[in-house]
Regions:
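One-carbon transfer enzymes
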Residues: 1-166, 210-213, 219-221, 238-249
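C-terminal active-site/capping subdomain that shapes the small-molecule cofactor and substrate pocket
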Residues: 158-249
Length: 249
């Protein structure tokens, strides 16, 4: 049903008389009247109570977390606040983008869900309340989040770029060209140049600590490409400043 909490949608679902309701990436909140006397569970892409909300994968990566995973929880009135029935863990490798991590967690999810359902059927399922003192929130991302602050460390910049790829993406102005940064690497050292300064013609940008190597970019209106392909035939001005504006609040 398009609107599950209205009378028609609610009646259609309850008429199924299912033993268990499984919710995965569903854009509507199931109301209390719909959930009464039902075993209803949800798969959420974080290690709850860390990163409740709409964008847990992006939030974990931008924050520099080194590990995330999936949680199966009971559905509750408050978003993502149900009892934790099971979790699976996965390391966040520096090379991952949010899109790649999403796909890996999507592969892990069914196994975790089946394990929880099996424990439910077998009567061995245990539930654990979330520690409210450890709750962090993952707000929905928008195009306005697509900025970067080169005054931060190179590692923080890498985490932000990969955590916002493929969407909304991080945009910079390099010379007279607008670029989306698709894949980067953090490098140590490189002196004390002004953050945002172009350090070499191969896409090295100074940060507050270390420097960011541009590996894959997407010029406006074009497909993603290696930075070397973008730079081929262009004059990359050493010492020029790459800019990225954070929209006003």
């Amino acid at each position: 049903p398009e609107r599950v909490n209205e009378t028609e949608g609610r009646d259609r679902i309850r008429a199924l008389d299912a033993d268990a309701w499984v919710v995965i990436a569903f854009g509507q909140k199931l109301g209390r009247r719909l959930l009464e006397d039902r075993f209803a569970i949800n798969l959420h892409a974080s290690l709850l109570p860390r990163w409740r909300g709409a964008a847990p994968i992006n939030a974990a990566m931008v924050a520099g977390d080194t590990e995330t995973g999936n949680s199966v929880i009971t559905l509750a009135e408050e978003m993502d606040a149900g009892l934790v029935l099971g979790q699976s863990r996965r390391a966040i490798e520096p090379r991952y983008t949010a899109g790649e991590l999403h796909d890996l967690l999507a592969e892990d999810g069914p196994e975790l869900m089946l394990r929880v359902l099996g424990q439910h059927v077998g009567g061995t399922l245990e539930a654990e309340a979330q520690d409210e003192s450890r709750v962090t929130l993952a707000s929905k991302m928008s195009k306005a989040d697509g900025w970067i602050d080169f005054a931060q460390s190179a590692e923080a910049c890498r985490a932000r770029v990969h955590g916002l790829t493929p969407w909304p993406g991080v945009g910079i102005e390099l010379g007279d060209t607008m670029l989306k940064l698709r894949r980067v690497a953090a490098e140590a050292g490189h002196g004390s140049a002004k953050p945002g300064a172009v350090l070499d013609a191969d896409g090295l940008i100074a940060c507050g600590e270390g420097a960011l190597r541009l590996l894959e970019v997407q010029p406006a209106g074009k497909k993603p490409m290696a930075f070397s392909a973008f730079a081929n035939g262009r004059e990359i001005a050493i010492g020029s400043i790459a800019r990225s504006e954070r929209p006003p609040c």
